[in-house]
Regions:
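Alpha/beta hydrolase fold serine-hydrolase catalytic domain that processes acyl esters and thioesters
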Residues: 1-24, 45-183
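Short glycine-enriched nucleophile-adjacent loop
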Residues: 37-46
């Protein structure tokens, strides 16, 4: 399993913080930071994982199929709260075991990735009953593409897709098929 540098750094940072802070903690991240937060907690020693009350993943991509059977990851699944907007794109990349919590965004397309567009009432995010058809289409398409690829091709494809979705050239699903950068 390939570990990206930011994941290793986050794991070390979490360990360093918990050496000086004695209490329980909540760990959180948005986008790639959400993936990194989940990784850091899951790959830490059990004594550290036990001090983490919850891991908040705000529309971070998931993990490879192989990672889903990692004992550290499996042990923290009940602690993970993954939030995605109803038209999620980034959060549909790769796989996860934890259920997603779908929240209402006042934006469309990739602009829903901005957590400041997620609607709240009081102290709660407004929930939506389901993902949009476009988000579900992206999820199914990615699963089909990834299933037919070798490990190195999957890594390249996921990195390229993430870069494309976060480049600003994608506003709606159709832009993925015809990115402005390729025209």
């Amino acid at each position: 399993r390939q570990v990206i540098p930011s994941q290793a750094l986050a794991k070390q940072y979490l360990q360093d913080v918990l050496m000086v802070y004695p209490g329980p903690v909540r760990v959180s991240g948005h986008s790639k930071g959400g993936n990194i937060a989940v990784y850091a907690v899951s790959q830490s020693a059990p004594v550290i994982r036990n001090r983490v009350l919850e891991v908040y993943n705000q529309e971070g991509p998931g993990f490879s199929q192989e990672f889903l059977s990692d004992p550290g990851y499996v042990s923290i699944v009940p602690k993970i709260k993954t939030y995605v907007p109803q038209g999620s794109m980034i959060g549909m990349i790769l796989y996860r075991l934890e259920p997603i919590i779908i929240v209402k965004s006042n934006q469309t397309g990739i602009m829903q990735h901005d957590p400041f567009s997620w609607e709240i009432c009081g102290t709660q995010m407004l929930r939506m009953p389901a993902l949009t058809s476009g988000s579900l289409f992206l999820q199914r398409t990615l699963e089909n593409w990834l299933a037919g690829m070798g490990r190195e091709d999957r890594i390249r494809m996921v990195n390229t897709l993430y870069d494309l979705l976060t480049s600003g050239d994608v506003e709606v699903m159709e832009d993925i098929l015809q990115p402005k950068s390729l025209m």
